[in-house]
Amino acid sequence: MKVKPSVKRICAKCRVIRRHGKIRVICEDPRHKQRQG
């Protein structure tokens, strides 16, 4: 899980979603997981 000030999709399978007021990226590749911090 990377915590970044701005989250972006890295590949075509990345999905940007909003959970509990936090913006997250979920993907099949575990290295692409991010959340906004």
Swiss-Prot record:
* Keywords from the named record: Ribonucleoprotein, Ribosomal protein
Q: Does the keyword Ribosomal protein apply?
A: yes
Biological process (GO), any one: translation
Listed Pfam families: Ribosomal_L36
Could you state one GO cellular component term attached to this entry?
cytoplasm
Instruction: Supply the InterPro entries for this chain.
Output: Ribosomal_bL36, Ribosomal_bL36_sp
- Give a yes or no for keyword Ribonucleoprotein in this entry: yes
* Gene Ontology molecular function: any one: structural constituent of ribosome
Q: Hey, which family's this protein in? A: Belongs to the bacterial ribosomal protein bL36 family.
State what protein this is by name: Large ribosomal subunit protein bL36
Q: Which organism is it from?
A: Thermobifida fusca (strain YX)
The gene behind this protein is rpmJ
